[in-house]
């Protein structure tokens, strides 16, 4: 299956929304104990690994327009999801602006 190439050269307009901090933490033992148990069948053959490629991503800081570069290694479907986040709902800050807005 051919993967659609994401539009990575897009410059996003400045947005006046407040900054959002996303903190990802593993589920604690207490929360896991209170959850509904999941019945798992005998493990069979593991699913085949999906083909992952490396992508270089450039975005602009939402405050000062500094170019921020990073690389990801993921599948075609996931890079398209990342593209959607970058162009619609996700703002990046450089380290200087993050400290300034702290």
Swiss-Prot record:
Where are zinc fingers of the kind unnamed found along the chain?
61-97
**What Gene Ontology molecular-function terms does this entry list?**
DNA binding; DNA-binding transcription factor activity; protein domain specific binding; zinc ion binding
| Sorted UniProt keywords | Activator, DNA-binding, Early protein, G1/S host cell cycle checkpoint dysregulation by virus, Host cytoplasm, Host nucleus, Host-virus interaction, Inhibition of host innate immune response by virus, Inhibition of host interferon signaling pathway by virus, Interferon antiviral system evasion, Metal-binding, Modulation of host cell cycle by virus, Oncogene, Transcription, Transcription regulation, Viral immunoevasion, Zinc, Zinc-finger
Per its UniProt record, what SUPFAM superfamilies does this chain match?
A: E7 C-terminal domain-like (SSF161234)
Give positions of region: E7 terminal domain. 1-36
Q: How is it modified after translation?
A: Highly phosphorylated.
Q: Which GO terms describe its biological process?
A: DNA-templated transcription; symbiont-mediated perturbation of host cell cycle G1/S transition checkpoint; symbiont-mediated suppression of host innate immune response; symbiont-mediated suppression of host type I interferon-mediated signaling pathway
Give the chief site where it resides.
host cell
Subcellular location(s) per record: Host cytoplasm; Host nucleus
Q: Motif Nuclear export signal, which positions? A: 79-87
Provide a GO CC annotation, any one: host cell nucleus
Any notes on this protein's domains?
The E7 terminal domain is an intrinsically disordered domain, whose flexibility and conformational transitions confer target adaptability to the oncoprotein. It allows adaptation to a variety of protein targets and exposes the PEST degradation sequence that regulates its turnover in the cell.
Self-association and partners: Homodimer. Homooligomer. Interacts with host RB1; this interaction induces dissociation of RB1-E2F1 complex thereby disrupting RB1 activity. Interacts with host EP300; this interaction represses EP300 transcriptional activity. Interacts with protein E2; this interaction inhibits E7 oncogenic activity. Interacts with host TMEM173/STING; this interaction impairs the ability of TMEM173/STING to sense cytosolic DNA and promote the production of type I interferon (IFN-alpha and IFN-beta).
Q: What does this protein do?
A: Plays a role in viral genome replication by driving entry of quiescent cells into the cell cycle. Stimulation of progression from G1 to S phase allows the virus to efficiently use the cellular DNA replicating machinery to achieve viral genome replication. E7 protein has both transforming and trans-activating activities. Induces the disassembly of the E2F1 transcription factor from RB1, with subsequent transcriptional activation of E2F1-regulated S-phase genes. Interferes with host histone deacetylation mediated by HDAC1 and HDAC2, leading to transcription activation.
Family membership noted in the UniProt record: Belongs to the papillomaviridae E7 protein family.
The identity of this protein, by name, is Protein E7
This protein's gene is called E7
